């Protein structure tokens, strides 16, 4: 179904959205729920979506059309997470927002009563990194265990050296949008 996203006319997509908040301590994490039809059904599978943007740009608003298409094309509910961005919120703040959103979904502390076996973590670029990292932390913490991920061109290799196997990194490895150094824990320690 994911391969058919471009075939769907975005102007003909019917979708209903619901804005909701998940709590992470004193912070409210905004999420937007995209329904593939007119009403919310608890038995539908869910994509928990983390947007890309190098951990410093993008939002659930900018990903509205993508998430609506995803819901419509796959008959899944899509829950898009508005995690906090660097540099205003250095690592690991945005990551913990994503983790807490996933924990709320998997432990039924959310508006949807979704079967945990029907939840898939999904993200592109930095969002793919977050989906993978949330899965690893969930495994390590033992609080819940995601069974599926869809990682779309995930940012998973942090080698920005001149010896990198990737030409783009060797040429542009110090450019701001490629490295987003303010999101790394090393940069956060320097502030």
Where are these regions (language model features)?
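A glycine/proline-hinged amphipathic helix-loop "lid/cap" segment
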Residues: 1-36
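Single conserved hydrophobic/aromatic residue that forms the stacking wall/gate
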Residues: 183, 187-191
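Short beta-strand element of the alpha/beta-hydrolase
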Residues: 43-51
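Alpha/beta-hydrolase active-site loop signature
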Residues: 54, 83-87, 156
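Catalytic nucleophile-loop/oxyanion-hole region of alpha/beta-hydrolase
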Residues: 59-60, 66, 79-118
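A catalytic-pocket lid/entrance helix-loop region that shapes and gates access to the active site
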Residues: 161-181
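Short substrate-entry loop that stabilizes the transition state in hydrolases
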Residues: 40, 53-74, 79
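Primarily recognizes the serine-hydrolase "nucleophile elbow" in alpha/beta-hydrolase
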Residues: 103-111, 117-164
């Amino acid at each position: 179904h994911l391969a058919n996203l471009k075939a769907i006319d975005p102007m003909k997509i019917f979708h209903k959205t619901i804005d909701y908040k998940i709590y992470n301590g004193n912070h409210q994490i905004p999420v937007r729920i995209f329904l593939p039809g007119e009403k919310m059904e608890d038995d539908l599978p869910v994509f928990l979506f983390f947007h890309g943007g190098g951990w410093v740009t993008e939002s659930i608003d900018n990903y509205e059309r993508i998430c609506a298409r995803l819901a419509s094309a796959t008959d899944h509910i899509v829950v898009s997470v508005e995690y906090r961005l660097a540099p205003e919120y250095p690592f690991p703040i945005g990551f913990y927002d994503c983790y807490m959103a996933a924990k709320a979904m998997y432990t039924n502390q959310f508006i949807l009563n979704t079967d945990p076996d029907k939840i898939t973590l999904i993200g592109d670029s930095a969002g793919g990194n977050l989906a993978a990292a949330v899965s690893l932390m969930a495994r390590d913490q033992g609080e819940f265990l995601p069974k599926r991920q869809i990682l779309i061109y995930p940012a998973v290799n942090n080698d920005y050296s001149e010896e990198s196997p990737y030409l783009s990194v060797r040429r542009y490895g110090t450019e701001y949008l490629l490295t987003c150094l303010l999101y790394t824990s090393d940069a956060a320690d320097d502030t």
